[in-house]
Amino acid sequence: MNIPMAAGGQELLVFRPRELRDAEQILLSVRANRAVVLHTAEAGDGEAQRLIDFACGGMEAIGGQVHRIDAETFLFAPPQVCVQLDDDLGRQVA
């Protein structure tokens, strides 16, 4: 996946994997200092859980961050990326 970006900018990749073998790209991307949004809606329930478990375990191993956006969407970020959630900004989450 080749995504153009502004000079000095960060990349944010969106993955919609269908099976577990696609999850390795998530870890490789975070190790390359890219944040990744994982959207599991296109995977079956069992496969989605395996994807999430694999990615979360990988994040633990490399010191990355995991943030749950909703039931099917997660943000995985390198340790040096500052992630501010609505709660951190003092806003009401609906």
Task: Describe each PLM feature range.
Residues 1-44, 49-94:
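Positively charged, small/polar-rich N-terminal and surface patches that mediate targeting and assembly
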